[in-house]
Amino acid sequence: MFRFDKEQMVIEFAGAKFGGQPGEYPTALSGTIFYARHKIVEDAKKGIFDKKAAEALINKQAEMQDITGNSAFVQVFGGTEEALVNYIDFVSEVWDGPMLLDSTSGKARMAAANRATEAGYAKQCVYNSINVAAEDEEIENLTNSDVEASIVLCFDPMDPSVGGKLNVLNDGGKTKDIGMLELAEKAGIKYPLIDVAVTPMGNGAGHAVRASFAVKAKLGLPVGSGIHNVPSAWDWLREFRKGLREEGKDQISKDVHHVCDIGANIVQTMASGDYVLYGPIDNAELAFPAVAMTDMIIAETAKEMGTATVAEHPLNKLI
């Protein structure tokens, strides 16, 4: 293991604390709720869902946080303005920790930031995300909100290299005339969470892992990603699982995906990751132990380098 010469930012908000040197703080884990085809969602456009089931999932993740010491985030996904607002209103009632405002719709993200500000729970929100595709209207809306934390995506479609990822943060790279960090600062973001933008296997997934080290070494900022998307987009794995099903090995087919899905989070954690977007919140009981174990190994090796591990760390809770 190693220590970075660069001083490392530690983020503390809404009850979560993460960042710093490898082994200092446990990795924060964010599970997604109300995602596409989530079985608890009854009407994805209006945001109608099974509240009892949703609360149970959020509580289970909170329970895993208490057991391992890894801070939990709830990543709230909504496809429409109405749905996302309904979802975050509910989550804010049953969860007082960090939650991500996530949507493929800029209008929905804007509506969510406005609603969180109006209702008084913006301080527990993380915007997802500030990136090169963000329109001026969305950035202005974020600036006028009370949201202080945001995922900052270091992805330049014109240059997916590690250098390109650093450049897009610092000066906009080959796509934008302003760096994403400067844009975040102008939008009032105090807590930037750098997402190293993992792309599919064979198309630069490794660049994102290396960028995790580079961002922390050069900038000292917390890094992470939704690296679990790599196996989901892996053509070979898809065909392999199909073959298993054709052989009547349905359970093994499911297990193979789970192993790769959860295992991907270990890769990000070992690459000095400070947070991981691990996918469906339904997988909390799989993701938390795997990442907690990884954190314990990192913390043990980091001790010999003078890194002090915080009290609420898996190394101190699970042995």
UniProtKB/Swiss-Prot annotation:
EC number: 7.2.1.4
Alphabetized GO MF terms: tetrahydromethanopterin S-methyltransferase activity
A single BP term in Gene Ontology: methanogenesis, from carbon dioxide
The reaction(s) this protein catalyses: 5-methyl-5,6,7,8-tetrahydromethanopterin + coenzyme M + 2 Na(+)(in) = 5,6,7,8-tetrahydromethanopterin + methyl-coenzyme M + 2 Na(+)(out)
Pathway(s) it belongs to: One-carbon metabolism; methanogenesis from CO(2); methyl-coenzyme M from 5,10-methylene-5,6,7,8-tetrahydromethanopterin: step 2/2
Entry keyword set: Methanogenesis, Methyltransferase, One-carbon metabolism, Transferase, Translocase
Cross-referenced InterPro entries: Dihydropteroate_synth-like_sf, MeTrfase_MtrH/MtxH, MtrH
Enzyme class at the top of the EC tree: translocase
Assembly, per entry: The complex is composed of 8 subunits; MtrA, MtrB, MtrC, MtrD, MtrE, MtrF, MtrG and MtrH.
Function: Part of a complex that catalyzes the formation of methyl-coenzyme M and tetrahydromethanopterin from coenzyme M and methyl-tetrahydromethanopterin. This is an energy-conserving, sodium-ion translocating step. MtrH catalyzes the transfer of the methyl group from methyl-tetrahydromethanopterin to the corrinoid prosthetic group of MtrA.
Family label: Belongs to the MtrH family.
NCBIfam families, per database record: mtrH
Protein name, per record: Tetrahydromethanopterin S-methyltransferase subunit H
Organism whose genome encodes this protein: Methanococcus maripaludis (strain C5 / ATCC BAA-1333)
